[in-house]
Amino acid sequence: MNAPDSTLVKAFLLDLQHRICNGLEALDGSAKFAEDAWKREEGGGGQSRVLTGGTVFEQAGVNFSHVMGASMPASATAHRPELAGRSFEAMGVSLVIHPNNPHIPTTHANVRFFIAHKDGADPVWWFGGGFDLTPYYPYLEDVVEWHQSAKSLCEPFGDEIYPEYKQWCDEYFFLPHRNETRGVGGLFFDDLNKQGFDTSFAFMQAVGNGFLTAYAPIVERRKDTVYGEHERQFQLYRRGRYVEFNLVYDRGTLFGLQTGGRTESILMSMPPLVRWEYAYTPEAGSAEAALYSDYLKPRDWLTL
């Protein structure tokens, strides 16, 4: 089978959402996800699952959406003018996890499928996705393990995949106005279709399935680390970068808002609490300073 099959993709995505939510509930140990099913007037809908006030996770959102429309939004046709005049179908699972403990990194993952149709023409389709890690306090062990997990899931698809998608992630999750990366990266891919549907779908599944395998050990390792108000305030300050990136640069956020997507689901990635501070400068020699100097820039984490 090499023709695109959106039914197959949707079944995988719904199962992935279910498995990730179960895994996060097990990690948290107390809180449960609340599900909010929704429909979109223009076509499609989804189910948003949100966990709040947990022992480990302050907020975790895992969203499935499947939307369709008769014409493409400006955010899509700007990059792909050949899509103008086509109907479209977009589906995906997107998640963001904001832990309580500043020693546990925030993380984001997304896997998605897009297909556009036009009478008398072949469909235009592709997969996209990835995952990335945003630590507040620098633990080299965690970052190396995260990138090793990313590299391992890429290896069956070719030796060039990890370095290419790792670089793409570094470049995508970058805040030009801050001149820093959002975190320590991971994988990012888009427009994936050149290898045909089966191989492209298999890679997307590997990324989706690999997320919790990469993240759970870091949570287990850091969840009982003692912290105080100083660390909490720094975490809230650094969360501001998440807000800045998502509202100014993130293509998925812009696409969702321009297509009349569900605002609550689109903005599910926002941290529940955040703060800004004028001209913040970390204390020299501190762990906070090490984050800025050593972690918020692209690095080859596997050959240090």
Curated annotation (Swiss-Prot):
Gene3D superfamilies per UniProt: Coproporphyrinogen III oxidase, aerobic (3.40.1500.10)
Listed EC numbers: 1.3.3.3
Keyword Heme in record: no
Catalytic activity: coproporphyrinogen III + O2 + 2 H(+) = protoporphyrinogen IX + 2 CO2 + 2 H2O
Protein name: Oxygen-dependent coproporphyrinogen-III oxidase
Residues binding substrate, per UniProt: 94, 110-112, 260-262
Major subcellular site: cytoplasm
Subcellular localization: Cytoplasm
Keywords: Cytoplasm, Heme biosynthesis, Metal-binding, Oxidoreductase, Porphyrin biosynthesis
GO biological-process terms attached to the record: protoporphyrinogen IX biosynthetic process
Gene Ontology CC entries for this record: cytoplasm
InterPro entries registered for this protein in UniProt: Coprogen_oxidase_aer, Coprogen_oxidase_aer_sf, Coprogen_oxidase_CS
Pathway listed: Porphyrin-containing compound metabolism; protoporphyrin-IX biosynthesis; protoporphyrinogen-IX from coproporphyrinogen-III (O2 route): step 1/1
Family named by the database record: Belongs to the aerobic coproporphyrinogen-III oxidase family.
Coiled coil location: none
